Amino acid sequence: MVDVNKFESMQIGLASPDKIRSWSYGEVKKPETINYRTLKPEKDGLFDERIFGPTKDWECACGKYKRIRYKGVVCDRCGVEVTRSKVRRERMGHIELAAPVTHIWYFKGIPSRMGLVLDMSPRALEEIIYFASYVVLDPGNTPLEKKQLLSERDYRDKLLEYGSDAFKAEMGAEAIKKLLMSVDLDKEVTELKEELKEATGQKRTRAVRRLDILEAFVMSGNRPEWMVMDAIPVIPPDLRPMVQLEGGRFATSDLNDLYRRVINRNSRLKRLLDLNAPGIIVQNEKRMLQEAVDALIDNGRRGRPVAGPGNRPLKSLSHMLKGKQGRFRQNLLGKRVDYSGRSVIDVGPSLKFNQMGLPVPMALELFRPFIMKELVARGLASNIKNAKRQIDREDDDVFNVLEDVIKEHPVLLNRAPTLHRLGIQAFEPVLVSGKAMRLHPLACEAYNADFDGDQMAIHVPLSDEAQAEARLLMLAAHHILAPASGKPVVAPSQDMVIGNYYLTMEEANREGEGMIFTDLDEATLAYRNGIVHWHTRVGVQVTSMPDKPFTDEQRSKIMVTTVGKLIFNNILPKSFPYLNEPTSTNLNGYVPDKYFLEPGEDIHDYLQNAEIIPPFKKGFLSDIIAAVYQQYKVTATSELLDRIKDLGYNESTKSGLTVGMVDVTDLKEKPEIIAAAHKQVSTVTKQFRRGLITDHERYERVIGIWNDAKDEIQNALIHSFDQQNPIFMMSDSGARGNISNFTQLAGMRGLMAAPSGDIMELPITSNFREGLTVMEMFISTHGARKGMTDTALKTANSGYLTRRLVDVAQDVIIREKDCGTDRGLKIRAITDGNEMIEPLYDRILGRYTQKTVYDPQTGDVIVPKNQMIVEDTAQQIVDAGVEEVTIRSAFTCNTEHGVCEHCYGRNMATGDEVEVGEAVGTVAAQSIGEPGTQLTMRNFHTGGVAGNEDITQGLPRVQELFESRNPKGKAEITEVTGTVESIEENPAERTKEITIKGEADTRSYTLPITARMRVSEGDFIHRGGALNYGSVDPKELLRVRDVLSTETYILGEVQRVYRMQGVAISDKHVEIMVRQMLRKVRIMDPGDTDVLPGTLMDIQDFRRANYQTLIDGGIAATARPVILGITKAALETNSFLSAASFQETTRVLTDAAIRGKNDPLVGLKENVIIGKIIPAGTGMPDYRQIKPKEVGGTSTEGVYSISDLEKQMQEDSQA
C-alpha cells in the first residue's frame, strides 16, 4: 500500500484501455461467483483466487502451500500466489469487451462531454450509440457530410445510390470511437480561438464551452477516444462481497449482479461474432452490452434502472460513491473507531470539572491492552495470554492495576449531534459503579445534554501524542468560553443558579439584623447557632479581607453586607473584588462607598434607609466567570466553577424551594382588563360593519387589542408577585422558566396560531390555573403540534446549513502571522433605526486596528496602528465617543487559503491571540450553524397596514443570504449618487416613479404603489442605497457598488437575524464565510493571458496570471467579481476530493477526470479522505517537523504499541 504521508497531491484522469489492463491481475471470463457445494471461488469467475489472491492468509486454493514461509510462491497446481488475503481488497481484474462501449458519464452528463468534443447534440449521439441511426465517418466523394446521421432506410437508399465503397457509415460505440480518434485537438482549438474573435450570443457561448473542454484534453494529456472503453475494470472482490446466510442462501453486493450481466452479454456477443450471425442480431447484442455497462457504471441514468429482486433498483458503481451512504461520506469522512464505547449518562455532582465517571465494565474493556501490559510488567501475569484470561475472570489484581492505568489517561466524550467543537471534550476518568457514565453538571451546556436518557460515546486516545493533545488542548477546563462569542459556555444553571440566588438574597428585619462581625468565621458561627439567617443584613470589618481590592479609605470602615454574600465571596479567588451588588462597576473592582458605615454611624439607622439589593442572577454569575477567566485564566476558573456548583447545590437544598398551586396567585385586575378588551373589539367590529374600515384593518386591530390586553395582564402580574414566591424566584434568577410561562399559568394564554400559521382572532382568556374550556383546549392543540413539527423541520434545515457552511470554509486555516495588507474595514455599531443590533464594543473587541484610533476630543492616541483592541481599550474607544474604527478583517486579508493572525484577531475560545494552524473556517461554520435550531422558521407578514412586503426572518433569511438568492420583499437600489428629484404615484398602474438626478445622468425607477419608501423628495442618496424598505439583492449591490460594500451588507444582515433572536456570534465568523462566497472572478477580456473569457477563476490565480503577463510585457486580463452561494462556492473549490464528497459527486468527478485535475490537499476534508494527518493545529507542516530531543539513553524493552499487543494476541491464539 502507498504511504499516504509521502505524497503532496493527488491527480485524477481518464483511464486508457492499456491502463485498465495494466491494473488487472487477470481477465474475468465467466459470470460464476462461488461454487455452492464447496463454497470455493470458481475458476475464471468474479471471485477467482488466481486473479484476486487467496481467501485465506498464506494459503493457496488447493491447500498445497500453507504457512508464511511460502510467501510469494505461486502454486503449481492451482496457480494461486501465497500471500495475505488482504490483497483481495486491492487487486483488480478486467473484462475484455467484444465491442467497444461508451462511458455513460461522458455521454450523458450535463453538458455532454462527448457531444462538445464532437460538436454533436446528445440526442444524435444517443441514436448512434444505441443503434438507431448510422453516422457518416467518411463521405468519400458523395454529397454526404461527415457526422451526418442516416436512418436505416436512408442508409440502404444511399448504399444503392452510391455503392458500398463510395462512403463509410457505421453505428454504435465503435463509430463514436472512430470519430473521437479523428478529432485533431490542436487544430480545433486554434479554429475555435479564431471563431471567438467574431462570434456573439448563443454561438459564442457554445464556442467557449467547446474550447474549454478541448483545451482541458490538450492540457491534461487525456485522449478523447478513452471516453469509449474496450476493457472494463473489475473491482476487488472484497469490496463487493458475497456472504452465506443461514439456510444456505447467499447475500451478495448488487455489483456482482451487474458484472454478471455484462459478462453474460459479452460472452454471447463473442459467440455470435464467431458464428458470423446476422448483423441485426449482433447489433441487438451490442446494444444490450452497452446497456449492461451503463447499468454497471450508473444504473438509472438512462432509461429504466435495472431492478433486482422485489423491483429494487440495483446499486451501481456511481451509487457506491454518492450520497450520505456512499463511500465518501460513510467510510472516508467518518469512520467507526476501535477503543470506543457508548452508554447512558447520569449526573455526577461530586465530580471535579475535569473528571467523568467511567463504569468499571467499560474501563476493563477500553483499557484492556494497557491493563495487560501492566499486568505483565508487574509480574502478575506470565504472558499476554494469561493477562487476557485474568481480565476475563476479573481477578482482584486486575482492579488494582486498572486504577493506576486510568490515572492521568484522559478520554474523549462525545454527544451526538456534535454541532460545534465543544461536542467533543476530554476528561480524566474516575471509576464508578453501575453501567452509566457520569457527566459533570457544568459540561451539560456545551454538550446540550440532559439526563432523561441521553447517551454519549467515549473514545480512548492511544498514542502519547494523542494523550498529550487531549490533555493540553481538549480538557474540559480549556472549554470555558464559547468559540462563537467568547462568552462563558459553562455557566451554572437550574439548581446551582437558584442556590446562589437564594444565598445572596437580602431581607429587611431578619433575625440578627445589624449585628457586626469581625470576619466570616464569626458570622458562620452565628448562623449555625440560629442567631442570624443567610439573608440577614450585617456589618463586617473590612480588615478581615486584606487581599480584596478595597480603597485605603474603605479598609478602615465597616461594610454592610449579608451573611450569604460573605459565604459567596469566600469561594471567589482571594484577590477578586468583594461582590456586594450585581453590577459591572462592582465586578470591575470598585465596591461603592454607600455600603460602608461612616465613623460613628449607627448600623440600624443606616439599614432603615438602605434599599434592598437584588440577588445574583444567572447572567451575573456568568459575568463573574468571564471576569475570573480574564484575570486568572484556566485553573482558577475551573476551581471556581466547582465551588459555585457545590455551593449552589448545597444552598438550593437548604432553601427548600417548592412549587404548589398556592404559589400561582390570582390576578384581581384580570376580569376588568378582559372586559375592556371585549368592549374595544365590539367597537372595531361595528366600524367594520358600517364600512369605515376594511376587513384586514379590522383583523389587525383585533389582534392588537388582545396583545395589548395580554401585555397589561403580564405587567400587572410582575408587580403582584411576592419577591419570595418560589415561581417568581425561579424565573427571576434565570434558573428555569420565563415571564411568559407565568402569564400563561396565572394570567391568560392569549392568541394562538391557526394551522395555516395565521393568528386566530379568538383569544384564550383562561389561564392554566383556572383551566381551559373545551374550545380553548382545542384551539391550543394547533399551536402545540405546529411547535413540534417546526422543531423537527428546523433541525434538518439547520443541520444542512451547517454542512454547507463547513464545506465552503473547511480549508480556511490561520496560515501566517501577518499578511501585510494595507486595506482595512471601517466598522460602526449595527443599528436598525433607533434599535441597537450590535454595539461597537462587541465589534471591535479582540480585533487589530488598521489605522491609529484617536480620541476625537483631545486628539490623544487610544490604540496605535496594528495593535489588538482589548477590553479596556475597547471601553476607552466607546467612552471617547468614537463612532467608526478601521480594523483588520478577513475581508481584506491577503493570505491564500486562509487568514493571517492579525486579520483574524483574538481566538474567541481562549481570549488570547489566535495561533497559526487554528482551523478558523470550521469553527466559523459551526458557530453560525449551531444556533440555527434556535432561529425561527417563520416568514412574517408585516400585515397590510405597514405595506405588503414579506420580511423573511430567522433561518430562511440566513439561508437566503448565504446562498445569495433573490430575496423575498426585494428593495430597489439606485445606480447613481444624487438627489431624489421626484416621487410620482400612478394610481392607474398602481406604481410609483422615483427620479434620481446624479452628477452625470438621471435615472428613474418604478416601484409598486404599496412599497414603503426609505427616501423622500430632496434626499441625497449614494449609489447602492435602497429606495424602499426590504432586502437588497447582494448580486445587484456587487454590480452597482464594490466587493467590500457587499460583504459589509451581508455581514450586517446575518448579524441582524441572529442578534434579534438573542444569539451572539462574533463578526469574524461571518466574515470568513462571506469572504469564501466572493473569492471568484469572471473573466471579461482575457487580454494576453491563457484564460478563457467567461470562466470563473480564483482571485489569487487571476492576480498571478496577470502579474506574469504584465512581467512578460503583455496586456492583462480584466474580470469582474462574482458572488456565489455557499453550495456553489463549495463545488467550485480547487479540491475535487472535497467537492465530490459534498454534492453532485458524479458531475464533479467527470469534470475533474477530463481536466486531469490535481488536488493539492490544502483543506481538511481532502486530507481526511485519503487518511493523511490534517494540515491544521498540530498537523501543520511547521509542527510536524519538530523532532523530540534525546535526553539520556532510553530503554525500549517491554514497551508495547497497541498493534504489537494485537499481533501477540493473534499469535498466542493461533498457538
UniProtKB/Swiss-Prot annotation:
Q: So where does Mg(2+) get bound? A: D450, D452, D454
Q: Does the keyword Nucleotidyltransferase apply?
A: yes
Gene Ontology biological-process entries:
DNA-templated transcription
Which reaction does this enzyme catalyse, per its entry? RNA(n) + a ribonucleoside 5'-triphosphate = RNA(n+1) + diphosphate
Gene Ontology CC, one term: DNA-directed RNA polymerase complex
Record-level Gene Ontology MF annotations: DNA binding; DNA-directed RNA polymerase activity; magnesium ion binding; zinc ion binding
- Binding positions for Zn(2+) 2 per the UniProt entry: C819, C893, C900, C903
What CDD domains does the record tag this protein with?
RNAP_beta'_C, RNAP_beta'_N
Describe its partners and assembly state: The RNAP catalytic core consists of 2 alpha, 1 beta, 1 beta' and 1 omega subunit. When a sigma factor is associated with the core the holoenzyme is formed, which can initiate transcription.
The protein in question is named DNA-directed RNA polymerase subunit beta'
User: Gene symbol?
Assistant: rpoC
